Structures are given as C-alpha cells and as structure tokens.
Amino acid sequence: MAIISSNIDDNDFSLRKKELRLVDSKVIPEEKKNNNLNLARPLNFKEFIGQEQLKSSLRIAIDASIFRKEPLEHTLLYGQPGLGKTTLAFLIAHELKTKCRIATAPAIERPRDIVGLLLGLKEGEVLFIDEIHRLNRLTEELLYSAMEDFRLDLTMGANRGARCRTINLPRFTLIGATTKLASISAPLRDRFGISQKIEFYTYDELKQIIVNFSRLINLNLDDEASYDLAKISRGTPRIALRLLRRVRDYAQVVMKTNNISVNLIKKALNSYQIDEKGLDSLDRNYLFFLNQNKNIPIGLDSIAAGLGDDSSMLEFVVEPYLIKIGFLTRTPRGRLLTALGKKYIDSKNENF
C-alpha cells in the first residue's frame, strides 16, 4: 500500500484546480451556487460599483418610464463575460419595482419554449435572456411582434389547415445580454430601444469590489494588496473575486493566516502560473507563438492549429484582454504582436 503525505507545499497546491483557467471570465459551477457571491451582489444602483456612464443613462430611462407609467424600452446589454450584465438586469427590475424572469438562449430550444415564457409574464415584468445571440431563427422571429406590439402571432396547424392566431401579451421589458453583438441579427437588434456596452472596470473600482468581498469572507487585505490584486484581475469583477477566493485558499491552507499581503498574493497566483499582468500560461503561449514569427501577421486559424486550441475560444476569450493592454493588434492580414507585447514576452521564459 502506498503512503501519500498529506503535507501541502507551494508546488502541490495548484494541482487541485489545475483544470480551471482562473482568468477565464465565464462563470463556473462553483460560482453559481456560492452563497457568499450572492451576498456580494449589489441590491440597487447605488451599491453597484463602476459603470457610471451606463448607470446614469439607465437611471434616466428608468425614471422616465416610471414617470410615464410605461414599461422600460427593451434593453440590450453587451460586453465581455463577467462584467455584470445579469446583475444589472436584476437591478433594473428592482428599480422598476417588478420581477425579473431569467432565461438563457441555449435553453430556449423550440418556439413553444419562448411562447411559454412570454405567456407567463405579468404587466410590467422584466424578461432577461442571456446569450441572446444564440436564439434560433424561429424563436427569434416570434419575439419580433412580442417586442414591437406586445402580441404573439402564431400559426396553428399545417398546409391547408393552417390558421393564424393572435394572442395579446402584457406590456413587458425584454433585457438581452450578449458577448457577441455582431452575431445578433439586425431585425432583432433594431427592436431594442436601449443598447449599452458594459466596459472593463478601472483598478480603483475593482479594488473597492475586492475590499467589500474580503470583508464578507473574513479576510484582511492591506491597501497595497487589494490594489495589486485589482491590477491582476483583467478589468473583470468575476475574475477579481475568483482570484481572491484562490488567494484565500492558499493563505488559509498553506500559510495558515487570514492576513493577505502583496507577497502572499504573488506566491498564491504563481502556483497557478498567473503573473503580475494577470496573464496565465495560455496567454503567454499565445504571445510566444506570435513572437516566433518575427513581425509577420498570422491568421487566427494558424495560431489555433499551432497552439492546439479552438480559434473561437482564442478570439473571444484570450484576445480581448491582450488587445486591451496593448500586447496584440488585429490587422486584415492577421494578428501581430505589438512592441509592448514583445517587450513583455522577451522578459519571460517558456518555463514561467
């Protein structure tokens, strides 16, 4: 019988979650059921940190709809994952003093699924559809009259026996969320009266989010540590809170403390191969690959083949942040490493 030591050191610590890319902004199962994360959600616009311009625009639209006693115009929120689109949808409903019913487009497989959702709505309620760009064509077309005239136009039967039936709907507000604005068809996009982009967060905004959450989970972060973690969080609250939870794991299990310093954060994130820029091994491999081609533009499919990854994942998950921090540029001929990106990658080695 083999005897395995239960001692945990710095090198072994990351193995428990090595399959998870911590800097991926998409939600993971752990985050869907984490009660602390639910407690961290703001209850109103005042508690929502960041997105000041967006909140101001929405505040005016909401107050105007309340003043006129009309439903808020259908609203489209777009931006990278993890920036708060779902949270904003719930806050909009809260400000309107109504319920928010939530659905995801992939789960709306058949026309009758969207019909059921629409018929279940009450006057003034909010219907939130996440990943709305993934609605199939038939389902999307049913939304046209529902959004425009608050009615459903249904075709009953087939061939010569087919007949049309119109069902009036209560006045409601549809809030759609998407990470791929260009993938939404023009007829659907044009039916949203309000369209707002959710931007990446500033370091100061992320720092405040981190400080607030650290109090909920009984961690002590000094001012420098909270700002340092904010800089690593890729402008995304979801990533900031995820990294903070992993730092907590390291602090409590390896260092036996609830006091978080800059040095402890560096050690914890190094165990997951995350560096001071918030980049992980996949980001660095991408940049290394470009650096090997000596300022020659490379097509996305060629990069994906070279790295053994999916091109769509690279385009929508890896590249946006590399572009944001000035390490990557897209050209008609392909992807190019910038001078800043080259300086960064030259300072690293392949065995980070």
From Swiss-Prot:
Q: Where does ATP bind?
A: R41, G82, K85, T86, T87, E148, D149, F150, R191, Y201, R238
Q: Which family does it belong to?
A: Belongs to the RuvB family.
This one is known as Holliday junction branch migration complex subunit RuvB
Classification from the root reads: Bacteria, Bacillati, Cyanobacteriota, Cyanophyceae, Synechococcales
EC code: 3.6.4.-
Where along this sequence does the record place binding of Mg(2+)? T86
What's the domain of life for this entry? Bacteria
MF (Gene Ontology)? ATP binding; ATP hydrolysis activity; four-way junction DNA binding; four-way junction helicase activity
Organism the protein comes from = Prochlorococcus marinus (strain MIT 9215)
